[in-house]
Regions:
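Extended catalytic cores of very large enzyme megasubunits
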Residues: 1-560
Length: 560
């Protein structure tokens, strides 16, 4: 047995032990589970034995002065992995203190501790039809990770199979009410999420404005004031321990009385940065003086209603409403406010806009509450106090030599990844009880893709072309349709998500909206016609299977 085999066995045992805790609350095994087909792997051959491995030294230096800020020698990667890929995995995802026996040093260790945990939890919760299917699942998942076909989001690599809490979700949506206890709890919850390697967003619109009175008779501070404290807290906490900075999103409704202050907040801070930079202060990203500037640790977004956008189009007035009683306390020119928003976004890229009515029209769970906010990157939108674990497919891996798109492998990859992502919710830990309860009840997933631009370039298609848009639309539709089809299949095996029954009508309505949107895709070239044909079939099956089984997941896909 080689050194790598010994390490693999030890790490698999550790990962299996971590996964065994998932057996609490375990569902009864169904009569029939998933059958998993081999696509990439060969029976009797481990994926690791099909590639050549090499040892490398990873030494990272400070670009300013050349000093070494990270060093780990003798790490092991496949010979086809780029230097950049190996550096990222070594510095970000290997666990254990550098220089100790606990430190991971091989990609095999990393993949094994994650994949073995997923397999164990899948078997415990009745996902697979047989032990053979579980073994194929493990090998296929290993092969795809080894060959960079896809990747889970960072918290999976940070936490799964370690002694740390098994936080698997990168994206969280919190809530905050108009009380000091709730505001202070917001700070605490964000800190716990950042510590686990993730990011969080929330809507501050319940907090009364600075133009309203407190019950004691004094004037309220307003949400922008409380943003300052949360921003400072995020700036001191590195996500995942020491691997990356915290990520935040703050949202404010367009009818909040403090909306103008919110819109201009970051633009004013950018003005300060320019002045301080010109005066000789170190204002680079990560510079020693940048911490003196506020609101640099969050993305800001304005939640715009259809009513507001119509007022902008018509040049009308728009009412800002008190948080305490809903009364209009100020009227503004809608077009002027929108212009300020656009100007601020032009100056500093913030705030963004979230279209509230459109978002909620595509909401699969309206009976459980409105969507009021998003995660930091704005691709995940769902109920308050929920989370979403992500995975991203590498589209270039599905481009054939003749420039066709390998739809068969793409569909199989999506099915396997969605299955793995759903399994992770069975063993995942969550930073708060409320988030854990809601996520387990709705099981939101976020499969997506990367390298669309590279795929279009390799295919000879311009971004701004009908052919490029058609291929992108067809691939996205196929991915999402396949994801929801697999979700419906899983519902038939391990049951629909807990919140499905009360939202069944709405969920099925949104699936039909997706089906109609797919029908609106206009294909241009043979490659996107082939992809779109499969997407159309997938959505037909989604509607049919969803009617029969329901769905395992309230959401399935995102695009960051």
């Amino acid at each position: 047995m080689t050194e790598a085999d010994v390490t693999r066995s030890a790490d698999s045992a550790r990962a299996d032990a971590a996964a065994r805790k998932a057996s609490s609350g375990k569902q009864a095994h169904p009569a029939k589970g998933l059958r998993v087909d081999r696509v990439y792997t060969t029976a009797g051959v481990h994926p690791y034995d099909e590639v050549s491995w090499e040892r490398r030294d990873v030494v990272m230096t400070n670009w300013r002065d050349g000093s070494i800020n990270f060093e780990q020698r003798g790490v092991e990667f496949p010979d086809f992995w780029s230097v950049n890929a190996a550096n990222i995995v070594t510095t970000k995802y290997f666990r254990g203190a550098v220089g100790t026996d606990a430190r991971e040093w091989s990609l095999r260790q990393l993949i094994d501790r994650v994949v073995s945990t997923y397999r164990a939890a899948g078997e415990q919760h009745g996902y697979f039809g047989s032990a053979e299917d579980a073994g194929v699942f493990e090998h296929e998942l290993t092969w795809m990770l080894l060959h960079q076909v896809f990747s889970f989001n960072s918290p999976v690599w940070f936490n799964v199979g370690t002694t740390s809490p098994q936080q698997v979700s990168a994206c969280f949506i919190l809530s905050v009410d108009d009380t000091m206890d709730s505001i202070l709890n917001w700070y605490r919850e964000e800190g716990l999420i950042f510590k686990g390697g993730s990011g969080a967003g929330l809507n501050l619109s319940r907090i009364r404005s600075s133009k309203e009175l407190l019950t004691s008779g004094g004037t309220a501070s307003g949400p922008v004031s409380f943003m300052r404290g949360a921003d400072a807290s995020a700036g001191t906490i590195k996500s995942g321990g020491a691997t990356r900075r915290a990520a935040k999103m703050v949202v404010l409704d367009v009818d909040h009385p403090d909306i103008e202050e919110f819109i201009e907040t970051k633009a004013r801070e950018e003005d300060k940065i320019r002045v301080l930079r010109d005066a000789g202060f170190d204002m680079d990203l990560g510079g020693k003086d940048i911490t003196s500037v506020q609101y640099q640790n969050a993305n800001n977004s304005v939640r715009a209603s259809d009513e507001f956008m119509r007022a902008v189009e018509e040049g009308g007035q728009f009412g800002l409403r008190a948080r305490t009683n809903g009364a209009v306390i100020e009227t503004v020119d809608a077009k002027s406010l929108f212009r300020k928003l656009a100007q601020a976004a032009w100056e500093c890229a913030d705030p963004g806009i979230q279209y509230d009515d459109t978002i909620n029209d595509w909401h699969t769970n309206p009976e459980s509450g409105r969507i009021t906010a998003s995660n930091p990157c704005s691709e995940y939108m769902s109920l308050d106090n929920t989370s979403c674990n992500l995975a991203s497919l590498n589209l270039l891996k599905f481009l054939n030599d003749d420039n066709s798109f390998d739809t068969e492998k793409f569909v199989k990859a999506v099915e396997l990844i969605i299955t793995a992502m759903d399994i992770s919710i069975c063993f995942a830990d969550f930073p708060t009880e409320a988030i854990g309860e809601t996520t387990r009840a709705y099981r939101q997933l976020g499969i997506g893709y990367a390298n669309l631009g590279a795929l279009l370039m390799a295919s000879g298609l311009a971004y701004d072309s009908d052919g490029g848009r058609a291929l992108a639309g067809a691939i996205t539709s196929l991915m999402t349709g396949t994801s929801y089809r697999r979700s419906a299949e899983l519902a038939g095996i391990v049951g629909p998500y807990e919140g499905y029954a009360r939202n069944a009508t709405a969920h099925k309505r949104v699936m039909r909206k997706h089906q109609a949107a797919n029908d609106a895709v206009r294909t241009v070239n043979p490659v996107d016609r082939d992809v779109h044909e499969l997407a159309t079939a997938a959505w037909d099956q989604v509607v049919r299977l969803g009617e029969k089984n329901g769905f395992r997941n309230a959401q399935a896909s995102v695009l960051a």
